[in-house]
Amino acid sequence: MEISVNKPAAEVWKRVGKFCDIAEWLRIPTCTITAGKDGEFGAVRSVAGEVLVAKTELSYSYTQTPSFQAGGRGGPRPYNLYHGTLEARPVTPTTSKLVYTLFFDNSMLADDMARERDIAQKKAQFTTALENMKILAEGGTLPPAPARGGGPGAAAPAR
């Protein structure tokens, strides 16, 4: 998933690229570093027990650990290899695009319909996140968050 931003990539990354900036643009109550140091390999954030596993000047990648997923919201679930990468990619000297890549295995879900629903939910959640990042990176203010369960298109709570 990606979105164009009318700001240089370095400025975009400075505004939305810290590991716990996720709380603002994904609209979750809080994010704290629970282990390690913010921005360093191995840092763990309170959001889904996610671990920083790779980074460049304008990107980072993270994973959810099997132990978190084993005790995750809604009870134990099979490990799905979930990884995410957020990148600010330069397009011109004054514009960029934010690219969010998710990698996961949802083959353990009951059937094709359940797998397609899972993918659609993730796309909706992270498309909304990208739209929020664009607003913030371009100097705007996010509109009020929809109420939880706010209907179609409402951002789902973090994993």
Ranges and model annotations:
Residues N6-A10, L52-S59, E87-K97:
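A short, structured loop/turn motif at beta-sheet edges
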Residues A70-T128, I135:
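Beta-strand/loop substructures that line and gate deep hydrophobic ligand-binding cavities in soluble
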Residues M1-K37:
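Hydrophobic ligand-binding cavity/cleft-lining segments
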Residues L58-S67:
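Short, solvent-exposed secondary-structure boundary/capping segments
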Residues M1-I3, A48-A54, Q64, L81-P90, ...:
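Hydrophobic/aromatic beta-strand elements that line small-molecule binding cavities or substrate pockets
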Residues K14-R27, E57, P90, E131-L142:
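Sec-exported extracytoplasmic/periplasmic mature domains
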Residues E11-V16, I22, L52, Y62, ...:
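Hydrophobic pocket/interface hotspot
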Residues G72-G75, P146-R159:
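Disordered, low-complexity segments in secreted/periplasmic proteins that are enriched in proline
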